[in-house]
Amino acid sequence: MKLLVILGVLCSSLVNAQNIGDTKITIVVNDNTDIYKKVKIAFVDLDFIIKDNYNIDTLTTYPREFSNIPGQCRLTAVIKDNKVTLTGIYGLKRLDDFGYFRSPKEYQNIIYYKGSKGWELLKGVAERIGGQMAFSK
């Protein structure tokens, strides 16, 4: 009996574990009152500025500079009932001929891999929102 309980716990933790290539974090919040406000506060806590696009179920941020590498990331939160789905994109700045960094022309999805700065920001927002996290592609 104990073995079955241990196997059940291990299997559930493996299902919700981060895998290389994951691009989304889905958070299920127990209490969905003021969930929009919670997500906004989580973004602001990590120095993101919210873009006001008048969409009641989606929050998007302006690009934010990474602290260690020359690049930017932009995050999006889609809110539906008590679920929040976080995704993001990043772009690396280019060094021009005069030694100045230029804004990225292309952005790519933030994916999970060891040492991903964008994923750390995405997960930081998810942890501030609270609730049960699940990771997917």
Label the predicted regions.
Residues L3-V15:
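Sec-dependent N-terminal signal peptides
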Residues Q18-K137:
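Ser/Thr-rich, low-complexity intrinsically disordered terminal regions
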